[in-house]
A protein has these predicted regions:
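Active-site-proximal loop->helix
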Residues: 119-135
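N-terminal glycine-rich anion-binding loops that anchor highly charged ligand groups
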Residues: 3-7, 14-61, 66-77, 294, ...
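Active-site cofactor/substrate anionic-group-binding motifs, chiefly glycine-
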Residues: 55-116, 120
Length: 352
């Protein structure tokens, strides 16, 4: 890419106008311009509109995230950890499935460092429900790392770590439709964990997320319900990418295989942050039903990703792995470990 940043920006826009994919270096340079506050909202909106029309690639996403990491506040998690997250934007307004699943997975032995924000398209994002539970979320890197070390669970509140992303906020809002930025959050956990369980709402983004994680060398499960849910679904089979050792295996899972009943998405409908916090507590306290079932499935995905895969990921029997992980997740709730961990998290978040 041209050395002058003005030329670099114009070069990238010209490429996008011709429907050409950007190189990783081009993508990083463009994001550096945005995060550095060097571009007007009109210029950023023009870039996002052109990029959305063309469609994104895994190489572009990797370049964008490279720049985000260069600007991110530091956090160091030395031990193996997993993030469990959905891209959002599925329009179903469910309870906070991945947040509840994170607590269950951590209480079952996975080390979880979750990255999230306030709601963008729903009534209650991860940050909103955690605040409603009484958890202090505005923590720096050393405080989050301390929690992960002490209780096996921590939350990176995105604005605390990716503050430069504020430069793109008004432009994104002015466009009024999803852009490539919508999948950057789930892929840019500042702790850079080794493992991920990520749900993807948009079909066109599904393989891109998988390829970014493959190229990163992560262990991951990336999934999308056939109903469009950005979680492992109860109302339809779920497509899943199993990622490990730089390889990707595509599979399909159906909860009925483990005796979990089909349930409509309406059975998972959430509400305000306070209402979702009440649902979360009830699930951790052992309430049965569809909400528990979907949390068990998604917690199992996080447990599997955390435990990792053999070198021959193509030989992995993902069905067997889910059978074992579902038992661990269920036991974590039924033993009281999950609800106890939540109370520890609330308490320790105010003490670190």
């Amino acid at each position: 890419m041209a050395s002058n940043s003005h030329d670099s920006w114009n070069h990238a826009l010209a490429e996008l106008a011709l429907n050409h994919d950007l190189l990783r270096s081009d993508s990083r340079a463009v994001m550096e311009e945005i995060l550095g506050g060097n571009r007007t909202q009109e210029e950023i909106a023009e870039f996002l509109a052109l990029h959305t029309r063309k469609g994104g690639t895994a190489i572009e996403v990797s370049g964008f995230i490279e720049a985000m990491y260069a600007h991110a506040a530091p956090i160091s998690i030395t031990d193996r950890a997993v993030d469990t997250v959905g891209t959002g934007g599925d329009g179903f307004h469910t309870i906070n499935i991945s947040t509840t699943s994170a607590i269950v997975a951590a209480s079952a032995g996975a080390r979880v460092v979750k990255h999230g924000n306030r709601a963008a398209t729903s009534k209650s994002g991860a940050a909103d429900v955690l605040e409603a539970l009484g958890i202090r979320i505005e923590l720096n890197g050393s405080q989050v790392a301390q929690l992960v070390e002490e209780i096996g669970l921590g939350f990176c509140f995105a604005p605390m770590f990716h503050s430069a992303m504020r430069h793109a906020g008004p432009a994104r809002k002015s466009l009024g439709y999803p852009t490539i930025f919508n999948i950057l959050g789930p892929l840019s956990n500042p702790a850079q964990p080794n493992a991920y369980a990520i749900g993807v709402a948009k079909a066109e983004m599904f393989p891109i997320v998988a390829e970014v994680l493959r190229s990163r060398g992560a262990d991951a499960l990336v999934f999308r319900g056939d109903d469009g849910l950005d979680e492992i679904s109860l109302s339809a089979p779920t497509q899943i990418y199993v990622i490990g050792s730089g390889r990707v295996k595509q599979d399909e899972i159906d909860p009925q295989e483990w005796g979990i009943a089909r349930s409509p998405i309406e059975a998972l409908r959430g509400g305000s942050a306070q209402e979702n916090a009440e649902h979360l507590r009830a699930i951790l306290n052992g309430r049965a039903g569809a909400m528990r079932d979907v949390v068990l499935l998604n917690a199992a995905a996080a447990i599997i990703a955390f435990e990792g895969f053999t070198e021959d990921v193509m030989a992995e029997n993902i069905s067997e792995r889910f059978t074992t992980a579902l038992e661990k997740a269920g036991a974590a709730i039924d033993s009281g470990a999950a609800s106890a961990l939540l109370e520890s998290w609330i308490e320790r978040s105010h003490q670190v």
